[in-house]
Amino acid sequence: MKNEKRKSGIEPKVFFPPLIIVGILCWLTVRDLDAANIVINAVFSYVTNIWGWAFEWYMVVMLFGWFWLVFGPYAKKRLGDEPPEFSTASWIFMMFASCTSAAVLFWGSIEIYYYISTPPFALAPGSNGAKEIGLAYSLFHWGPLPWATYSFLSVAFAYFFFVRKMDVIRPSSTLVPLVGEKHAKGLFGTIVDNFYLVALIFAMGTSLGLATPLVTECMQYLFGIPHTLELDAIIITCWIVLNAICVACGLQKGVKIASDVRSYLSFLMLGWVFIVSGASFIMNYFTDSVGMLLMYLPRMLFYTDAIGKGGFPQGWTVFYWAWWVIYAIQMSIFLARISRGRTVRELCFGMVLGLTASTWILWTVLGSNTLLLMDKNILNIPQLIEQHGVARAIIETWAALPFSTATMWGFFILCFIATVTLINACSYTLAMSTCREVRDGEEPPLLVRIGWSVLVGVIGIVLLALGGLKPIQTAIIAGGCPLFFVNIMVTLSFIKDAKVHWKDK
């Protein structure tokens, strides 16, 4: 019994370093928020201006990798011996469900305002040209390109799971073909895993930092409770306690039901916005934006604004590419898990078609609604952001719809459930990654899951205390830097191993 308990406990070499590093960074930040903001601005400026080009080339190279997988020698290789675990419809629906987080609702509702007010290509702010390129850039940042770049990692993890039968819970496990077992399981592998975990902790804390103000602003609208940092902290604490109760009482089935409710409610809310906001305008704007995307795609791919130095590609494209990089391993593991039995080509096409449809629907419907409210002078978004913050501006885009109280209740429930499932997924992923001998289908220790959910909650509160979007963007970019190299190593490891076990015919 004692030995069994030891085997299922924490793995010190990947548990304590991330805990200590993140704890120290949080303590230093809280101790002097002004100094922390100065450092944050410096880090953001350095990474985006000096190394932004690397993120752009990474995405382009990975895009070519997608074409190689779809039309190359491994296109018809099957990921596992069994038939597909899920029907195609269920498979696509699960992909859509993975895109309906509160952070996505945050960006989908407000992103277009930033593109119109500070547009790329030296366009005049608020001009027709800025509005025409606004949604096109959202479709670029959340469209086929980033989903195609996930294909290599998704195929790689599916290959290691179902073809090589490896028990992969940390990225170092996949690096054996590339660096050898000694290094993959030694100091090098430990460093890789710690980079991954620190970046993942900050990414999850960032998502929580985006989601929480939406819920508290909904509470202010519905119940008249003033939105303060203290209320944000109380709400995050309630989520952590609720997550602990669910885990302790074996209510994971309830969390699964909540996740399904989130998906169906997302469909309902998006359908409602589409109908009442202006279906004809939305479809026309979307069609026009696809044309703009195709026309400007080459420049968007390589746009660094080296001469004009307007800062648009650094503030948005590089930031979003870092966002995609930092979530790549976690998302690819999920996509691989649900793709057992499918061919490489099926997985690559399914990701690009299914996931692009999901994100394009979200950004088109929500972004078009925001633009309409601005054009009709129903909302003064710059004033709302200046006086009350970004979250209030987002809430007002929903409150401006017909039957505002019912609409706000729907949005409140959607954001609340999305964040509960986010914290549950965060604590589970981090606990699985920092414990030893926790097999697929088993549960990691309760206290470890609760501990990680607390730490993620603390990061969310710290980011909220710093204020504004820049700390959140910097946390993503800083975390994306080490994972940039980790993702490349996992990809190269797959290619090297597949040459041996998937010999060309």
Curated annotation (Swiss-Prot):
Functional pathway: Amine and polyamine metabolism; carnitine metabolism
Residue stretches spanning the membrane: 10-30, 50-70, 92-112, 143-163, 195-215, 231-251, 263-283, 316-336, 347-367, 403-423, 446-466, 475-495
Gene Ontology terms describing biological process: 4-(trimethylammonio)butanoate transport; carnitine metabolic process
Subcellular location: Cell inner membrane
Organism domain of life: Bacteria
GO cellular component annotations of the record: plasma membrane
Catalyzed reactions per annotation: 4-(trimethylamino)butanoate(in) + (R)-carnitine(out) = 4-(trimethylamino)butanoate(out) + (R)-carnitine(in)
Membrane topology type: Multi-pass membrane protein
GO molecular function (one): (R)-carnitine:4-(trimethylammonio)butanoate antiporter activity
Disulfide bridge positions per record: none
Keywords for the protein's UniProt record, in alphabetical order: Antiport, Cell inner membrane, Cell membrane, Membrane, Transmembrane, Transmembrane helix, Transport
InterPro entries associated with the record: BCCT_CS (IPR018093), BCCT_transptr (IPR000060), BCCT_transptr_CaiT (IPR023449)
Function comment: Catalyzes the exchange of L-carnitine for gamma-butyrobetaine.
Membership in a protein family: Belongs to the BCCT transporter (TC 2.A.15) family. CaiT subfamily.
Subunit structure: Homotrimer.
Name of the protein this chain belongs to: L-carnitine/gamma-butyrobetaine antiporter
